[in-house]
Each structure stands twice: as C-alpha cells, then as structure tokens.
C-alpha cells in the first residue's frame, strides 16, 4: 500500500510539473504572438505611410540671366510642389533637393527663414521676392503659392493637403562647356525632391536647344 501510494504521489507530481511546463510554454507563445502582431501592425502602418505620403512635382520653371536669352544660362529654378493624395504633413525643413547634370551632383537644404508668403508679381525678381538675396548655391527658399492650413512657419514650414509652394534655388553651381555659370542649352538634368517620409518627387528634363525666353517651363 505504501508503495502504491508513493507511485501515485510521484505520478501526481509529474502531472503537475507537465501542467506547469505547458502553462509556461503557452504564456511564451501568447506573448510572442502578441509581440509579432504589434510589430506587424506597426510595420503595416509605416508601409502605408510610406506609400501614401510623398511630394508631387507640378511644374519646374527656369530663369535665364540675360536680357538676350540665347546668350544666357539658367541660373535660377522654381520647383512647384504639393503633397501626394492622402499624404500627411510634410516638413519642408527636412526636405532635400538633389540635382545632377551628369558631371556634378548638388544637394540643396532648406535654410531657416527663407520663406516668402506675400503676393507674387514676379517670382524671379530679387527686388520683389527678396529671399533670393539669401539663397546660396546649396540652399533653397520657399515661395508660398497656397497655404490652406496656415502652417507655413518660416523656420519649420509644413506642407499639407491643399498646399502648393515653389522651392526656389540657384543653379549657378553648374557650369557649361565654355565655363559659364548656370545650366546651358541641351543639358539633361535629373534629380529628386526627397521628403523625410514618403515618395520623392522625380526631376528629369532636358533644357531646350536654344533659349528663346527668360522664363521657361522645364518640366
């Protein structure tokens, strides 16, 4: 009887141990499943944000620095942009503009305070859009075309759905074959307008073979 009782107690102990092990294992599995689910949800949200967010390029205009356009080069550029459909707010202070003529690649950054939000009668005129005077070869300024959310702070401008701005930059860092500063005729320019999150706006155009106007549509 004592032997049978001992065997019964031993079996009970083994059974309890098995139950405890199973419970611990189940807890680990449930915890892991919960972690993986949360991670998958976070990844899904991030992917959705990446796909839906981004910058759309509307038009690109170039400005020739000569009263006789055929004798000049493009020394200023205005890139008109707005958010993609479904995009969240885009911090323009974190946007990068990349341009290349095949010989040189330039990265432009926003310089705090270079934002113009008044009426525009001549976009490329330094005396009217005065921020041109402080735009360097590697910085860009912002001219506000439409600010639906009134969030275009000079230091931290935010581009939201319904907004349109022109990103203003100088192209005098490029040189023609005859060593003139600016972008000459028949030059292919490629690049991107890259937001911190979301799809980049693609730049890809070739300048006209002859410049007939001081202001021209490039893309």
Curated annotation (Swiss-Prot):
It comes from Pyrococcus abyssi (strain GE5 / Orsay). This is Flagellin B4. The lineage of its organism: Archaea, Methanobacteriati, Methanobacteriota, Thermococci, Thermococcales. The keyword Protein biosynthesis does not apply. It comes from the Archaea. It is found in: Archaeal flagellum. Keywords: Archaeal flagellum. GO terms for biological process: archaeal or bacterial-type flagellum-dependent cell motility. Its main location: other. The gene is flaB4. One of its GO terms (cellular component) is archaeal-type flagellum. The keyword Ligase does not apply. Flagellin is the subunit protein which polymerizes to form the filaments of archaeal flagella. GO terms for molecular function: structural molecule activity.
């Amino acid at each position: 009887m004592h032997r049978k009782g001992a065997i019964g107690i031993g079996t009970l102990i083994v059974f309890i141990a098995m139950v405890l092990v199973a419970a611990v294992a189940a807890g680990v599995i449930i915890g892991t499943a919960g972690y993986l689910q949360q991670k998958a949800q976070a990844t899904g949200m991030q992917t959705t944000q990446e796909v839906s967010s981004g910058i759309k390029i509307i038009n690109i205009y170039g400005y020739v620095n000569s009263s006789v356009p055929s004798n000049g080069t493009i020394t200023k550029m205005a890139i008109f942009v707005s958010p993609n459909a479904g995009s969240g707010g885009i911090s323009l202070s974190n946007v990068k503009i990349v341009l290349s003529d095949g010989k040189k690649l330039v990265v432009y950054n926003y310089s705090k305070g270079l934002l113009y939000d008044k009426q525009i009668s001549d976009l490329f005129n330094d005396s009217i859009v005065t921020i041109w005077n402080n735009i360097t070869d590697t910085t860009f300024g912002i001219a506000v075309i439409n600010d639906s959310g009134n969030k275009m702070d000079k230091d931290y401008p935010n581009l939201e759905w319904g907004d349109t701005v022109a990103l203003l930059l100088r192209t005098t860092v490029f040189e023609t074959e005859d060593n003139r500063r600016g972008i000459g005729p028949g030059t292919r320019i490629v690049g991107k307008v890259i937001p911190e999150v979301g799809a980049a706006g693609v730049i890809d155009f070739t300048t006209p073979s002859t410049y007939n106007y001081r202001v021209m549509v490039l893309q």
